[in-house]
UniProtKB/Swiss-Prot annotation:
It comes from Drosophila melanogaster. InterPro entries: Cdc42, P-loop_NTPase, Small_GTP-bd, Small_GTPase, Small_GTPase_Rho. Interacts with Frl (via GBD/FH3 domain); the interaction is stronger with the GTP bound form of Cdc42. The GTP-bound but not the GDP-bound form interacts with mbt and gek. When GTP-bound, interacts with Pak. It is found in: Cell junction, Adherens junction; Cell membrane. This is Cdc42 homolog. PANTHER family: RHO FAMILY GTPASE. One of its GO terms (molecular function) is protein kinase binding. GO terms for cellular component: adherens junction; apical part of cell; axon; cell cortex; cytoplasm; growth cone; lamellipodium; nucleus.
Amino acid sequence: MQTIKCVVVGDGAVGKTCLLISYTTNKFPSEYVPTVFDNYAVTVMIGGEPYTLGLFDTAGQEDYDRLRPLSYPQTDVFLVCFSVVSPSSFENVKEKWVPEITHHCQKTPFLLVGTQIDLRDENSTLEKLAKNKQKPITMEQGEKLAKELKAVKYVECSALTQKGLKNVFDEAILAALEPPEPTKKRKCKFL
């Protein structure tokens, strides 16, 4: 059975672990536990063929900046996550996360993933953002950044309601299986 390795990166507390747990177990975790490193595996059927989708969770906290890249070799696709209600996590996609993955895995495809879309219309969240003269990140802003950074696509979801959740992983699988241009090997390699 062919395995697809999918690594999830992004700032701490943007919902990376919730995204994976909600997708793999259909349950939303109730408390926040910062991740050091975890992985999950699910079997998916693509065109009648079974594939193992290996999902690798990473810690977004800076303390793990040297440890995190150890999970990057052999990656087929990255999910670069930010919370749509955390403008700083959106900024860090461009400032930190895409530079980090492209430094280690230049040709590996990645999706830009907006998380926590259920909070986009929540009053307390909007008030908190307004106090700092901020607004939630829009779908259009996500699509624009994805294009600018050459992501395969921009997708967004809520791990809580599961809206858009399956689509995130369907798109990740498609990105990993897209036939590469003949001159490029797309799997991440460390030299």
